[in-house]
């Protein structure tokens, strides 16, 4: 019951309500909230049930713009979601429940926020818990969380643990864990993928060289086969030339061959006598006469 609690933790809710719906200061759809520093001036006073004395004035100033932002002393949580940016302080967990919207805080306790009631109570060393419909953003000291659709878990040394808190984000589509300094599992995965790709390229290169060597050996085998075939053909031609009978000027036995012989004799005999490459070199001067006579004989 908010009435039973003291005035020790004050908060100015800057959320606007339109059509009976309240927008939470922690997260506003299409709104940007810049909250002032929460000065911890001691222990909270007026708290029911064993609360220590102290003043925790919390001032909140915010303008409803495209992104909501809450800055607290000691750390930042930036979410690039449509719902806004949340920057959370050192040593605490922040979880928002849009449905219930309750934020209650006590020293060493839990804080729940209710958008309908518009109450925000923050305590030193406390926790803020809630369930968002689309996701949870929890941030620790020195970690930045940027979310578009998936879950980002950020913290020192690639874990979601801050100095006194944890950073956890959960959404249905996936998880991304990032460490301080911009290095995380995604970077390691990319490096592993690059290394594997280079190894595959090297293997393919080795395979390609082996394939090239195999192709060269096949070409050499084909050339050897062609050379063997050519040698065999030459040997066969030589054998045929040796087995051939020389041209004979003897009278043929068949009448057909005899007729051809008689027809060619006036041409062949003078040419045989007068051709320059024949045995009788002295008759080469008559070559012109015999050549013209052979032409006339053929014409007749």
Swiss-Prot record:
<keyword id="KW-0769">Symport</keyword>
<keyword id="KW-0630">Potassium</keyword>
<keyword id="KW-1003">Cell membrane</keyword>
<dbReference type="GO" id="GO:0008273">
    <property type="term" value="F:calcium, potassium:sodium antiporter activity"/>
</dbReference>
<keyword id="KW-0739">Sodium transport</keyword>
<keyword id="KW-0472">Membrane</keyword>
<feature type="compositionally biased region" description="Acidic residues">
    <location>
        <begin position="158"/>
        <end position="175"/>
    </location>
</feature>
<dbReference type="GO" id="GO:0006874">
    <property type="term" value="P:intracellular calcium ion homeostasis"/>
</dbReference>
<keyword id="KW-0109">Calcium transport</keyword>
<keyword id="KW-0406">Ion transport</keyword>
<keyword id="KW-0915">Sodium</keyword>
<keyword id="KW-0106">Calcium</keyword>
<protein>
    <recommendedName>
        <fullName>Sodium/potassium/calcium exchanger 1</fullName>
    </recommendedName>
</protein>
<dbReference type="GO" id="GO:0060292">
    <property type="term" value="P:long-term synaptic depression"/>
</dbReference>
<feature type="compositionally biased region" description="Acidic residues">
    <location>
        <begin position="92"/>
        <end position="102"/>
    </location>
</feature>
<comment type="similarity">
    <text>Belongs to the Ca(2+):cation antiporter (CaCA) (TC 2.A.19) family. SLC24A subfamily.</text>
</comment>
<feature type="region of interest" description="Disordered">
    <location>
        <begin position="1"/>
        <end position="251"/>
    </location>
</feature>
<keyword id="KW-0844">Vision</keyword>
<dbReference type="GO" id="GO:0005262">
    <property type="term" value="F:calcium channel activity"/>
</dbReference>
<dbReference type="GO" id="GO:0005886">
    <property type="term" value="C:plasma membrane"/>
</dbReference>
<keyword id="KW-0050">Antiport</keyword>
<dbReference type="InterPro" id="IPR004481">
    <property type="entry name" value="K/Na/Ca-exchanger"/>
</dbReference>
<keyword id="KW-0633">Potassium transport</keyword>
<keyword id="KW-1133">Transmembrane helix</keyword>
<feature type="compositionally biased region" description="Acidic residues">
    <location>
        <begin position="126"/>
        <end position="136"/>
    </location>
</feature>
<dbReference type="GO" id="GO:0007601">
    <property type="term" value="P:visual perception"/>
</dbReference>
<dbReference type="GO" id="GO:0015293">
    <property type="term" value="F:symporter activity"/>
</dbReference>
<keyword id="KW-0813">Transport</keyword>
<feature type="transmembrane region" description="Helical">
    <location>
        <begin position="259"/>
        <end position="275"/>
    </location>
</feature>
<comment type="function">
    <text>Calcium, potassium:sodium antiporter that transports 1 Ca(2+) and 1 K(+) in exchange for 4 Na(+). Critical component of the visual transduction cascade, controlling the calcium concentration of outer segments during light and darkness. Light causes a rapid lowering of cytosolic free calcium in the outer segment of both retinal rod and cone photoreceptors and the light-induced lowering of calcium is caused by extrusion via this protein which plays a key role in the process of light adaptation.</text>
</comment>
<dbReference type="GO" id="GO:0060291">
    <property type="term" value="P:long-term synaptic potentiation"/>
</dbReference>
<feature type="compositionally biased region" description="Acidic residues">
    <location>
        <begin position="109"/>
        <end position="119"/>
    </location>
</feature>
<keyword id="KW-0812">Transmembrane</keyword>
<feature type="compositionally biased region" description="Acidic residues">
    <location>
        <begin position="215"/>
        <end position="244"/>
    </location>
</feature>
<keyword id="KW-0716">Sensory transduction</keyword>
């Amino acid at each position: 019951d908010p009435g039973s609690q003291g005035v020790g933790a004050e908060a100015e809710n800057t959320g606007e309500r339109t059509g009976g719906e309240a927008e939470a200061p922690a997260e506003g759809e299409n709104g940007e909230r810049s909250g002032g520093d929460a000065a911890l001036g001691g222990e909270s006073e007026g708290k029911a049930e064993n609360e220590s004395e102290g003043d925790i004035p919390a001032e909140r100033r915010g303008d409803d713009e495209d992104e909501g932002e809450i800055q607290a002393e000691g750390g930042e949580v930036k979410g690039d979601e449509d719902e806004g940016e949340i920057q959370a302080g050192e040593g605490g967990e922040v979880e928002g429940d849009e449905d219930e919207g309750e934020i209650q805080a006590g020293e060493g306790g839990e804080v729940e926020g209710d958008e309908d009631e518009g109450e925000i109570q923050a305590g030193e060393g406390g926790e803020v818990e809630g369930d968002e419909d689309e996701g949870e953003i929890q941030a620790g000291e020195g970690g930045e969380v940027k979310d578009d659709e998936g879950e980002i878990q950020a913290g020192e040394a690639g874990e979601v643990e801050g100095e006194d808190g944890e950073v956890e984000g959960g959404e249905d589509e996936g998880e991304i864990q990032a460490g301080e300094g911009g290095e995380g599992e995604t970077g390691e995965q990319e490096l592993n993928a690059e290394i594997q790709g280079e190894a595959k390229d090297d293997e393919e290169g080795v395979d390609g060289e082996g394939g090239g060597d195999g192709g060269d050996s096949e070409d050499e085998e084909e050339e050897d086969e062609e050379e063997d075939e050519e040698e065999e053909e030459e040997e066969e031609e030589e054998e045929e030339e040796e087995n051939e009978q020389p041209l004979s000027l003897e009278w043929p036995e068949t009448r057909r061959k005899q007729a051809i012989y008689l027809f060619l004799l006036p041409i062949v005999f003078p040419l045989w006598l007068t051709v320059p490459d024949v045995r009788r070199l002295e008759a080469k001067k008559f070559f012109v006469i015999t050549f013209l006579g052979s032409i006339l004989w053929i014409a007749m």
